[in-house]
Amino acid sequence: MKMRLAFRVLTLAFAFALAVAQPSRAADTVTVDDTARFLAGMPPSADSPLAPLTKDPAWQRHARFFDQAFGQLEQRQLAKIRAWSDTNLAAPRPTMYYMFSGPDFLYADAFYGKATTYVLSALEPPGSVLDLARLPRGGVGAALYNVERSLSSILSFSFFITKQMRVDLHAGQISGTLPILYVFLARSGKTIHGVTPVALDENGLVISENLGKSAVRGVRIMFAANDGVERTLYYFSTDLSNPGVKASGFLKFCATLAPGNSLLKSASYLLHSGNFTTVRDFILANSATIIQDDSGIPLVYYNQKRWRFFPFGRYAGPIAEFPGRYQESYAELFRRAQPMDFGIGYRWRSHESNLLLAVKLPDDGSGVADAVAPDAPPPKPGRPRVPRPIEPQRGGLFFWFGR
């Protein structure tokens, strides 16, 4: 009897020790979602190894800064963009393409929040985020400061100043686009479930070994929004010029997800040039809708019989950094533009911004499948005035991310 009682006591003690030890071991691991929240100035899980670091004055200052900056951005732009999208997009497709995007998930989500697969692409490599809990003293504050600096332009305007960001994101313990994607996902209310490095072979197939010179490297992020729907974000580091895309399988991979919707914003007018015709043709052929500012696809390349146009805002021409990109056809189209209450692109002030919603018609040319925006009567012509140039930021020009 005594031996049986002792065995039971020993069994209960072991079970209790196991129950206590398991959460402890789990808590030793920093999850990607906690890392994203920490970088975004949001509290991680209570049992996260990062939780004690939130008592650091550097993190608390960082959190206050991002709370204010993202709060202002939400009120000034993001909430208005989501309302615009709800009003003007009738049936968004599951796939969303964002070429020349950099890590700009923020506006991809604002315009196409109902997408389930996002494909972002630019030259900058995905980079990495080290275990922040293991950084040396002072390392966390430096990492957070670099993130703040790299986001300063997009939080103030709606685009990255890439030269500045490239320096900031290679100056410390974090690098590339991944930390910025983390911040934007967390601040957009997403929960990250997993992050996996990926690569594409020349046929557009996802591979993990025997990577050749033409392999396109990237990252796949699995996440969910408040609706609980599992979503996928791909970011690929790739050259989108004609030689670049012809030598890689990136567009072949994108074609497996077609048709989708496309966003083109602050794209350095690269799609105006003859060196980006392949990606331009792909976007036109594989998009049901295209949302763009005037730095996207010139109007002349749209088949007028296949597309219907809904202009918003005011076309004031390109900023001084991009001379020779003025479009007479754009100016003519925007004479019937509807008003817009938010700014976007290089001309980020709301009274100077332009946005074009291009909707592809069904093959028979009847109806409008993916938009509900009504045509507006032409406004009364106003007195012409010379567009005011944008004030340059210190640290670089307004080029496509990674250029």
Language model segments and positions:
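Short, thiol/selenol-centered motifs that function as redox-active sites or metal-ligating centers
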Residues: 101-113, 119-120, 157-182
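N-terminal secretory signal peptides that target proteins for export/translocation
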Residues: 1-6
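Short, surface-exposed basic-aromatic patches at helix termini and helix-loop junctions that form
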Residues: 89-90, 178-191, 211-213, 225
